[in-house]
């Protein structure tokens, strides 16, 4: 999309990437009320604050920034769909439940989804997007694009 956009990318305020948000990884087996957040602060501290505020007000999830670390060997920030927007300077946020034993396997079936968790993550995402869409001003881009390849 970013190479052949339907809408001018200069009018794109942010990208929200939702990829695998209904499962629980090993770290959180005893507390599935979490989500990994990647990229929210890389190009816009406003985007990061909006998401934190939405979480504190509406969802109460543990926001884990483990995979947002620039030194993370998984480099998820550079590997998922949102990066095609981020490389153009569009602030991006990526919601991710982490990897599990069925990651990219046929055994990743609907019966393994934690629907209560997914509902709460959806609530967070809704309120983050609601705030982005209803602001009087665009969020400030105050970070620099870094090459990922």
What are these regions (language model features)?
Residues 96-149:
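His/Asp/Glu-rich mid-to-C-terminal helical/loop segments that flank catalytic regions of hydrolases
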Residues 1-92:
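Metal-dependent peptidase/peptidase-like ectodomains
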């Amino acid at each position: 999309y970013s190479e052949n956009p339907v809408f001018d990318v200069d009018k794109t305020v942010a990208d929200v990437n939702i990829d695998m948000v209904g499962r629980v990884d090993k770290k959180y087996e005893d507390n599935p009320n979490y989500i990994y957040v990647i990229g929210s602060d890389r190009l816009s501290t406003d985007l990061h604050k909006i998401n934190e505020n939405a979480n504190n007000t509406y969802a109460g999830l543990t926001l884990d920034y483990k995979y947002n670390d620039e030194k993370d060997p998984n480099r998820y920030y550079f590997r998922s769909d949102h990066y095609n927007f981020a490389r153009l300077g569009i602030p991006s946020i990526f919601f991710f439940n982490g990897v599990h034993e069925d990651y990219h396997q046929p055994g990743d079936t609907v019966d393994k989804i934690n629907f209560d968790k997914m509902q709460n993550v959806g609530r967070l995402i809704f309120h983050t997007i609601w705030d982005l869409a209803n602001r009087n001003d665009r969020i400030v881009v105050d970070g620099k694009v870094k090459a990922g390849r």
